[in-house]
Amino acid sequence: WSNLEENTASYSCPRCGAEIVCDKTTTATFCCYCHGPVVLNDKFKGEFKPSKVMPFKVNKETAIEKFLKWSKKIWFLPKEFSSYKQLEKITGIYIPFWLVTSNVTGEMSARCKRINTWVSGDYRYTKTDVYHVYREANLNFNNVPHNASSKMDDNVMESIEPYDDRELKDFSIAYLPGFFSEKYDRGKEQVLPLIEGKIRMGTNDILRNSISGYSTVDIVGTNERFNKTSCQYALMPVWMMTYSSGDRNYIFAMNGQTGKV
């Protein structure tokens, strides 16, 4: 761990306040959020050591190619956003995430109808059967992610998910050279309720999808019980580029593992 402190440093942007951590050999000439100048602040603090890291698989050339394809689909995008000078500023950055693994027992009650209609002679008949349906399941959710940086828009980060958590690695300084890395500033106590909300939705989706063969399904009640939950801090790879024009900020973000834009 002392090695980690010796080889990394923190830079603070005086314009937007973003705090970026990178290898000391990396030249920090602009903030990847606002492109303002950055200055050396302090060293990587031990309490911010991540447990896991998702290494970059997409290189800068591929990121630029995908950006150019993406930019052609966006109306009224300033031409300067895709200029050569701007393309050079596309940045690989490790974004802090909290990953939650949880075992959940989910329950769902529903009132379902099966409606049959037929015609006999001059009459049309309808038969409605009503069923009270109950579902219960024990489910495991592994490494459900959520952005741990207040500088990043949650919607932007969620739009480039998912990551393949099978490729998570134990954190090592060896993954940092050539990339920026931001420290988290949203503690797990802030983010955990948001992740639990995702897990509740996922549980209910699974239970709801198990109810089929009915004309109508009305959910009467749901319940989710978290039996066991663990949380770990990880760095996830993102290619980013921002551009400011007047009072508007344009953001391009791409999953550095899968290439999803």
Please state what every model-predicted region is.
Residues C13-C16, C31-C34:
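Short cysteine-rich clusters marking metal-coordination/redox-active sites
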Residues W1-T8, E19-T26:
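Short, flexible, mixed-charge glycine/proline-rich loop motifs
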Residues A18-E19, P37:
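Cys/His-rich metal-chelating microdomains
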Residues M236-V261:
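Extended, hydrophilic extramembrane loops/domains of integral membrane proteins
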Residues K24-F30, K43-K49:
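Short cysteine/histidine-rich zinc-coordinating motifs and their immediately flanking basic loops
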Residues R15, K24-T26, S245-D247:
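A generic beta-sheet turn/junction motif
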Residues D23, F48-S244:
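Charged, low-complexity helical/coil segments in non-catalytic cytosolic or luminal regions
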Residues H35-D42:
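Short Cys/His-rich micro-motifs in 6-15 aa windows
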